[in-house]
Amino acid sequence: MAPLSPSRRSVLFFVAFFVVAIFSPLCRASTGDELPEFKNCVQACIQQECDVDSPKSLPLHLQLFLWTCPSECDYVCQRHVTHDRIEKGQSIEQFHGKWPFYRVMGVQEPFSVIFSILNGIQFYRGLQLIKREFPNTYPPKGIYLFGAYVGMAAWFFSTIFHTRDSIPTERLDYFAAGGLVLFNLFYAPLVIFRPFNSTPMSRSEQKFETWVYVWGIICTVAYLSHVYFLQFVRFDYTYNMAANVVVGLCQNVLWVYYSITRYDKEKRPWAFWPGFIVVWMTCSMSLELLDFPPLFDALDAHALWHAATIPVPMWMYRFLVRESKDDIYGKRLKM
């Protein structure tokens, strides 16, 4: 067998590292739920505070975030058991798949909320950049604008989920995140292969080659089928993660291919930007491997992952603006 070229070795490295970074966290299980002291604490709290004629009323700010007497008991017991384990020199355990974060004004994961908001703001900035830099006659402009809205929606639902974890907020977060991942795969071939006429055209002219519309239908059907399965057949965490990993791998391979081939053809340094973003995102996701107990009871590896993704949207939008210049000014060399 002939040895692999450096470019192919690079692609395989990114693929392997991405898979390890994503799937390794799935190997860890939450054990705090099964601790006898936690179960006994929750049971006693509910009996004494909730299953009574006049249950204790929660503060208004907790009620606004849909905290109930049983969920308050669960939170209080998490904090109590964790404090006792620290005092005894025992390890901190996760509860319901999460670390026992210190709640701030009813917000469960304050740092993840802050970083999710900042990510959403970056997509809003990208939206304004697209509106300002792309002429209306540039065919992909509408797709890029739609992508910015998808990104803002994804981080909005991430903010809601990290504010208050519940089945509805969790599923909205997962569905929106999956939509963003799949949309990123949808538009990657449009940037790489440019199946459109960049010169001004009449409204009756077809903006893109036919395969783009077919590709869009395939992505839409795949997304709707994915959501339908999770919502109405079985909400399978492993399947959901695997689906997102496969889609993410596909787009990462495409972007690495773009960076290598584009730079080889035109020797333009900015052609490496997508490849750099792939490396950055892969390393950022590897933060999940750390999965340490939260610093200050609030900052964990998952929150740091969200922090690491904050600059990525604007990096990508600035790349799209720079990449489109040759299209807009008629200097494009077809790949």
Model-derived features with residue positions:
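Cleavable N-terminal signal peptides of Sec/SRP-targeted secreted and luminal proteins
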Residues: 8-29
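C-terminal regulatory/interaction regions
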Residues: 2-6, 335
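Multi-pass alpha-helical transmembrane bundles in non-GPCR membrane proteins
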Residues: 24-335
